[in-house]
């Protein structure tokens, strides 16, 4: 961290009466954000979020064409928030308005990329289950939270504390980007020759109708990263508020199956088949407006697309950002992809993988 950035952070804390807080650095994630816990004598702790605005390529302007988005870079193509604090603040406000437990925003300055948040604690779903907690009540509550969120119709613009953030749709280019990046990165990562133009053309033909269904079903607030390391158990609260939510700033209007793929096709832990089936049954009971067979078909198709996106991200983390810990997660993600491709309707795509990516290259 530069001395200028350190001084800026100290000034921000001082302006909000937090200069005397003891600062504890927290473990980072795959993003460019940094977190600290602020300890205050006799008071509850807070979280200090640091996301320099210039660290990433820009987000997607609402009216940008596909060509303009491609020129702007990955965040605009995929409709990611580029770590913008105003996206986090606006999404948090919307989630809280739906009765869900996003952190309360104590202070925020989008211009500097700094914010102070409510501290929801350390009881991540992933850690609790790893230490022997029963996953059933945790996942039941997560499903209930998704059902609550998915029954609401989010507005085109999210607003909070004078900030506005466009709530964009997970459109064809955004869905396509994950697949395109997989085609680009996986051969380099696995030591393969680049895919031929014919293979890429066939790929596009196979995936286009699945993306079309994803866009047609884009009707809900999609957290986009709804998995066990972004969910915090808050047993002192009631109902869906027991599920604390993190890392939601990239939210988009999307198909409800996307969040379900993130929850059940978790890259970092195995959700038992029994629990996965129970989650799907519970969600569909809470959403009688959805047709079961149609939802499951979309869950498999979008789940496969999501798994490929994660494979690209982890391959890039290992090869480009030199974060080798992500390599250990790849076999599980391949397992999720293979499970999705086992669906009868995805047999042609399964055939593409069998022809173009040998088993020994599915690392």
Residue map of PLM features:
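Juxta-kinase regulatory segment immediately upstream of eukaryotic protein kinase catalytic domains
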Residues: 1-22
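ATP-binding glycine-rich phosphate-binding loop
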Residues: 18-41
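Active-site acidic catalytic loop and adjacent metal/ATP-binding pocket
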Residues: 32-39, 47-48, 149, 207-260, ...
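ATP-binding pocket architecture of kinase catalytic cores
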Residues: 39-177, 188, 215-216
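Active-site catalytic-loop/activation-segment of kinase and kinase-like phosphoryl-transfer enzymes
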Residues: 165-210
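All-alpha amphipathic helical-bundle segments outside canonical DNA-binding/catalytic cores
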Residues: 169-170, 292-303
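Active-site activation/catalytic loop segments of kinase-like enzymes and analogous catalytic loops
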Residues: 180-190, 253-290, 304-321, 333-341
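ATP/Mg2+ or Mg2+-diphosphate-binding catalytic cores
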Residues: 312-363
